[in-house]
Amino acid sequence: MAKKKSTKRKKSTRNPEAAERNKRIAIVSSLVVLAGAVFVAGAMGVAELDRAAASSIVSGTPEVVIHWDTLSDGSVWMPRQEQERLNLAIARAVQGGRALSAEPLKEAVLTLQSSGWVRGVPEARWTSEGQIVLDAAWRVPAAAVRVGSREVIIDWDRYVLPLDYAIGQSNQYYFTNTDAPLPQTGQQWVGTDLQDGITLLRELSKNDLLEQVAGFDLGSGADSGVISIITKRGTRIVWGGGPGRERPGEKNTSVKLDRMRVLYERAGLIDGGVPYVDLRGKDIMIDSNPGG
């Protein structure tokens, strides 16, 4: 068997400058590799977080919390049935929405905004518990307008609310003989006659003269815009043009209010205890037998 031939290595001459240069290159290369490894690991961690977050965003029916408007005692004034109707409509609108996404918020806002109950655009937000919270500027019922056999509820700006009742069942001051026809829910009832009527309603309220009032007749035909106050006794007090919009020969609002106070002080009734009173002229006109 032939023996392997042994060879001797020649010792190389070591260059100190080259060795130092190679050392620096090795250190820099190590740092670059380490940074790359950290970057990749970090990227993988972010991706895992994204996947974990995405897995928690699932389709479903988020719980909706509506901040209702309240009275001074903290109680909600909106009828329970109407609260339930709105809750159901909004729950249907957001059903199947992805939690923490914008789409359910948009649907909730659009549904509440189109209900006729709010002014402007409602605000919606997600809570950390996955609930949708809704805040809005609510339209408050002010009166009813009689249309046919129904009483349609309006707010103080004459916007039609999604409520109507049989005649005498609304528990609101009513208006009859409006010039303009009934608009759609959520739209404003136009016409200076109804505007004047609401203004008079405010004036009587500020002067504590509403207790015996049932409603207002806005006049028709030649007397359109001539407002008459209808008392709970069924008597009539002719007021005239709206406050600040008096017709020629009419006394102003302060005089008419003073006359109502005088009648109340004498008889304990704002109509003075008679069926017909006219507040417009130089003197109070009283008719004890208007049908005679």
Task: Annotate each PLM feature.
Residues 1-70, 89-292:
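Charged, solvent-exposed interaction patches on well-folded alpha/beta domains
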Residues 74-89:
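Histidine-centered catalytic/metal-coordination loop motif
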